[in-house]
């Protein structure tokens, strides 16, 4: 929302509704994904260091203006997907959840295990019933209070593996089903997908997973995690790298072919 406009400064929900939505409709799109909706202290984090999971970011306007944006999109036939960050939270103590009751372990993992080495943020303890209740109630809140049409779950790869998938090639079956898998996080994602689709079978869930976890979009009753779609990050990341780092005459057609075909054919991918 904030960066979707040409003016200097942060854009607002109202400006997005009035200026951007009509252009999206004219371009023929039927869905948008809104990022950085939940409140976050540092704008440069792109909304991924969430401090208040139940507050729409006030830097873009009021909750009512966000609801107006979503309603306007629906009136144009455009679905609105929220970028949902349940993979980690900001480490700030004053405005975040960390040390909320004086210790590390209320909803989060403690010590080194509870710190993400790349994101400099804190990690949820998905094995705690209190954490599950907090996150699941947050899922329901955004759907029922703001009328979002579903979620793109951020950082699913980080959630699925105890080492967060850092430095793993994911080339062997043991990479997906060994001791490194965070079974408690898998259970949470299954619960979240169950809740969402019980509330409305037309709600959409999308997993940002770069590992290619088998079954991520399979039905839960078949042993899957229950997402509707997987967000394929490999191709856009490849294009960005190619355009930034290589001259056109140096493009490798084998790399192009491999990247464009390297996906699971039974998984619906965006």
Regions flagged by a language model, labelled:
Residues 1-2, 270:
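Active-site-proximal beta-strand elements of phosphoester/diester hydrolases
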Residues 2-180:
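Substrate-binding/active-site clefts of carbohydrate-active enzymes
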Residues 147-149, 164-270:
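Conserved alpha/beta catalytic core and glycan-binding cleft of carbohydrate-active enzymes
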């Amino acid at each position: 929302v904030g960066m979707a406009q040409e003016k200097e400064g942060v854009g607002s929900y109202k400006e997005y509704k009035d200026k951007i939505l009509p252009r999206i409709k004219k371009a023929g799109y039927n869905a948008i994904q809104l990022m950085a909706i939940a409140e976050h202290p540092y704008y440069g984090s792109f909304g991924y260091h969430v401090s208040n999971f139940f507050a729409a970011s006030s830097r873009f306007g009021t909750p009512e203006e966000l609801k107006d944006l979503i309603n306007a999109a629906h009136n144009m036939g455009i679905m609105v997907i929220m970028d949902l960050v349940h993979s980690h939270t900001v480490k700030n103590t004053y405005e975040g959840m960390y040390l909320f009751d004086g210790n590390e372990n209320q909803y989060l993992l403690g010590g080194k295990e509870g710190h993400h080495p790349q994101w400099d943020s804190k990690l949820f303890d998905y094995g705690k019933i209190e954490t599950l209740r907090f996150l699941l109630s947050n899922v329901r809140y955004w759907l029922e209070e703001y009328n979002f049409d579903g979620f793109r779950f951020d950082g699913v790869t980080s959630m699925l593996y105890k080492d967060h998938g850092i430095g793993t090639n994911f080339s062997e079956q043991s990479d997906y089903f060994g001791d490194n898998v965070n079974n408690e996080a898998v259970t949470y994602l299954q619960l979240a997908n169950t809740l969402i689709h019980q509330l409305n079978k037309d709600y959409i869930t999308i997993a940002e997973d770069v590992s290619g976890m088998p079954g991520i979009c399979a039905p839960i009753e078949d042993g899957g995690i229950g997402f509707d779609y997987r967000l394929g990050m490999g191709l856009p990341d490849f294009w960005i790298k190619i355009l930034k780092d290589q001259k056109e005459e140096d493009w490798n057609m084998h790399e192009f072919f491999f990247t464009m075909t390297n996906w699971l054919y039974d998984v619906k991918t965006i």
